[in-house]
Amino acid sequence: MSGKTSSRGQQDEISGEKHEPTPTKEIKRRRKEFEKIHIPNEIVEEILVRLPVKSLTRFQTVSKHWRTLITSKYFGKRHMALEKSKGCKLLFVCDDFVDRAEDTLFLKTVALEKTSVSEGDEQAFEFEGYKGFLDISESCDGLVCFYDTTRAVEVMNPATTMFIELPLSRIQQLCIYKPNPEVELEPVQDPNPVLDPVMTCSQIGVGKDSVSGSYKLVWMYNTSPATPPTCEVLDLDGKKWRFVNTTSLDHHQILCDQRPVFANGSLYWLTGDEEGYATTQTKLIVLDLHTEMFQVIQTPPFITRDASGDKIGLCNLDGRLCISELKKDCKQEF
């Protein structure tokens, strides 16, 4: 028998033992396997654009490239268009009836057409100072406003659970701090200053400038004594309230119980006579969000001459303005 010592490989072959590769070799092997997998950026984009917002929020941390893609305006427009094509979603808002928390609201989003990626989503949100009543605006591209006359407006996207708090508008300052001589409306910008914080028909509208793509909040309200309505506008990019001239709305006030509706780049309100009553032919106030100019137009012929605001409905139907009236025979005419 030879006195030479067998090599490690020969010993393993004789004994039948197998040794795991060293960590370095294992890393190199896995790296080579990963290098074999290549998904073109175009395919990655097509996959990502079909995912829900919550998943996209998480995937922003995967890489700088993914974050840049997901947060780009181009991707946002594609994702928004695809979401709209999937059908309508409903947002339900209710109080906390379980724990009786006065400052908590439950928000639940439900898709009308159930799919594997459109499950209902429920979130609980705390609103500091909330005591059981908040106004809620109509939605625009998923953005919703929660507000009242004595607390700051909060703009929320229920899909991402992100929100921003806006500065107080002038009418809110008057309602909170009156009498306060430091709070005065600018006579140059507003030819009809609010002398009395009593207001009616106050509802915030949310819309999108069809040219610049920026989102705007519009707060128009009737004031006492009777004047043309007062209008404040806030651009979400600048976050500053300012007045818009309403002299073209002389002898018109918005009807009660109406939320402004956004469609075709404009916001719409119903208007009656100088006192805000539908004693004359009900008409439509239209605000172009790009030019920020008002006009008053006729309602369709089927609308009753003295129909009250609670009988006429305005809504956005597939991006277009839809108007209807509940007739005396309880039939809805569109």
Curated annotation (Swiss-Prot):
Residues 1-31 are annotated as: Disordered. It comes from the Eukaryota. Residues 33-79 form the F-box domain. InterPro entries: F-box-assoc_interact_dom, F-box-like_dom_sf, F-box_dom, SCF_F-box_component. Residues 15-31 have a biased composition (Basic and acidic residues). SUPFAM superfamilies: F-box domain. Residues 1-13 have a biased composition (Polar residues). Disulfide bonds: none annotated. Signal peptide: none annotated. NCBIfam families: F_box_assoc_1. This is Putative F-box protein At2g02030. It comes from Arabidopsis thaliana (Mouse-ear cress).
